A protein has these predicted regions:
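Solvent-exposed loop/turn segments flanking beta-strands in beta-repeat/beta-sandwich domains
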Residues: 77-91
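Beta-propeller-forming repeat regions
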Residues: 43-57, 67-69, 76, 99-585
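Short, solvent-exposed loop/linker segments at the N-terminal edge
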Residues: 62-66
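Positively charged, low-complexity intrinsically disordered regions
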Residues: 3, 37-39, 91, 375, ...
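Sec-dependent signal peptide cleavage junction
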Residues: 28-41
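Sec-dependent N-terminal signal peptides
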Residues: 12-28
């Protein structure tokens, strides 16, 4: 097994701000004053007594902050009484009593380089309750500022065209796969030879690993040669779908996929990759005026490496073992390529996925296909033995035509109409929890979207979206009805937008985009015209106050509302992000 040291790639570094994990921080007192709001009606109406929940433990984490201090964080659980405080032990000796009013966080003075085990015990009315304790062992010679997880990369490979490739860690998700109440990491490995849907060419195989935080690998899934590598092809849902306390993984597979136990799904000999057509021009699938489509020497043959035919499956994998538990034909099925807008699988192989509580009680995987033209969403239920279809929404169904071409590169899930069930915000449209169309704004495809309650005084939830059509720019709408609350039109492709509460002097969440002409409030008013220093990729809770910070690549920045600019708060040298300009952490 190949392993990697702390400073060599690939190793997974968790750069964790312990203060950001707790809502309450001493940094809040005297700095921010929460306005007194009258809460608006029609908020999400989940019945939490019926909602299937994860069976999580304390999630204790200890990270060395400097040579003399260790930061310890843990979870406050929904089952904890509101007056729960905590006793913190190091190697069996109590080192702190943490009051209920100071959050689930403590800095311990500990300068030794030896390993130390931190244990958390909840306390109610002065007595330890024994209710869900937790512990974490800080390793000897622990690095400062992060947790290092050694990884085992897949073996390098060579495509049928003779192109060599290596492997890099890509997207990851978390889930409790063994039922111990703590998360494991499901990591996707992408080959260096991966392709966007617009590009021709062979790719390497995609792999998935499951790791404990110690670096122990539980299993590896090889997706096989019939699953193309690239950002849009494989969306993997990690969740406890059947309520047994252990997470499953649900994703699209094909003939030749090898599960975590070495079992092959379907026909191991099948190879659906196109060899390429030497009689056709090269250059990929781009508009004529796009310089990326200009043929260049060494370009792969037209359609080479694309998968235009062949079996597609939907598989449920056991989270603990990686074993395939159930495989069915994939829905939404490919069908005729032309039904999606082209014959090269650029449009048909745009996949999204989500987990949604469609019945208000149980989580359902929702697998989605297409957004530039035809869009199809299929919801399922997993009961531990059978994967049953709940509903399918298809924009090609008569009456659904307005929903075609409205999807984004991403989606959002939430109860937007107050019925206690989740709806799907699919770009510029919304799908109700029963699989029926809720509304379509007709503003089309975009690259970013945000769903939340932007202000306690506003009814329901809202959506901040940006659009690619060189017309609609950025729009703020009612999430339940699609009614546009304000809009900043633009004659360009608005590729990014962001929404986050970064300014305590302005009520509600702030919004901006590449073409918003400044930082805007919930009324659409410009409260800062200069947003040159603002990133538009990710927002995080980082420093322990009630505001959000911005994350772009390996830099966390914070808005200085007095100066009107964003300033770097932390830069993580040696850390990297995924997916190019999207900079997925």
């Amino acid at each position: 097994m190949r392993t990697t040291s702390i400073m060599k790639k690939p190793s997974l570094k968790f750069l964790i701000s312990i203060a950001a994990i707790t809502v309450i921080s001493i940094g809040v007192s005297g700095v921010l004053t929460a306005p007194r709001y009258k809460i608006a009606a029609n908020a999400p109406a989940y019945d939490y007594s019926k909602l299937q929940k994860e069976k999580l433990g304390r999630g204790v984490v200890a990270i060395r902050e400097n040579q003399s201090e260790v930061a310890v964080s843990w979870r406050y659980l929904s089952s904890d009484p509101v007056n729960t405080s905590f006793n913190l032990y190091r190697d069996g000796k109590k080192v702190a009593e943490v009051p209920a009013t100071t959050g689930t966080f403590y800095r311990d003075t500990y300068g030794s380089k030896k390993a130390a085990t931190y244990t958390i015990k909840p306390v109610v009315n002065g007595a330890e309750t024994g209710h869900i304790e937790g512990s974490y062992t800080l390793p000897a010679n622990a690095p400062t500022g992060y947790i290092n997880i050694p990884l085992d990369p897949p073996t390098d490979g060579t495509t049928p065209a003779g192109q060599k490739y290596t492997y890099i860690p890509n997207d990851a998700s978390i889930g409790d796969v063994d039922g111990n109440g703590e998360y494991e990491i499901i990591l996707k490995w992408d080959p260096s030879k991966a392709n966007d849907n617009a590009h021709d060419g062979y790719t390497g195989n995609v792999f998935f690993d499951c790791y404990r935080l110690t670096g122990e690998r539980l299993w590896r899934i090889d997706m096989g040669r019939n699953i193309r590598a690239g950002a849009h092809y494989t969306q993997f849902m990690v969740y406890d779908f059947d309520g047994d306390g252990r997470a499953e993984i649900i994703m699209k597979t094909s003939d030749g996929t090898i599960d975590g136990q070495g079992n092959i799904i379907g026909d191991a000999s099948a190879d659906y990759r196109e060899p390429g057509d030497p009689t056709q021009p090269t250059g990929g699938d781009f508009d004529k005026e796009d310089p990326r489509g200009k043929p260049r020497q060494g370009d792969p043959l037209r359609n080479q490496g694309r998968i235009l035919t062949g079996n597609e499956y939907l598989t449920v994998f056991n989270g603990l073992t990686g074993a395939a538990m159930k495989t069915i034909d994939y829905i939404p099925e490919r069908g005729q390529l032309e039904d999606w807008g082209d014959n090269r699988a650029n449009r048909s192989d745009r996949f999204l996925a989500a987990v949604a509580y469609l019945d208000g009680g149980h989580p359902s995987p929702v697998m989605c296909r297409g957004y530039y033209t035809r869009a199809v969403l299929a919801a399922f239920d997993w009961n531990g033995k059978e994967l049953k279809q709940r509903w399918v929404f298809d924009s090609n169904t008569p009456g659904n035509e307005a929903y075609a071409g409205q999807g984004n590169h991403n989606l959002r899930v939430g109860d937007v109409d107050g019925d206690g069930c989740d709806e799907i915000i699919y770009g510029s449209c919304a799908i109700d929890n029963n699989g029926k169309g809720l509304y379509s704004t007709g503003m089309g495809h975009g690259d970013a979207i945000h769903l939340t309650k932007f202000s306690p005084t506003m009814k329901g939830r809202q959506v901040w979206d940006c659009h690619e059509n060189k017309r609609d720019g950025s729009s703020f709408r009612d999430a339940a009805t699609g009614k546009v609350l304000f809009q900043v039109k633009s004659g360009t492709d608005v590729g990014r937008c962001m929404a986050a509460d970064i300014d305590p002097t302005n009520p509600g969440v702030e919004m901006w985009s590449w073409e918003s002409k400044g930082l805007r409030n919930i009324k659409g008013e410009v409260i800062n015209p200069d947003i040159e220093s603002f990133s538009t990729n990710m927002a995080v809770w980082w420093d322990g106050d009630l505001l959000r910070e911005l994350l772009d690549k390996n830099v966390v920045s914070k808005y200085d509302w007095k100066a009107g600019v964003c300033k770097p708060l932390a830069t993580f040298t040696g850390a990297a992000s995924n997916s190019g300009t999207k900079a997925t952490p």
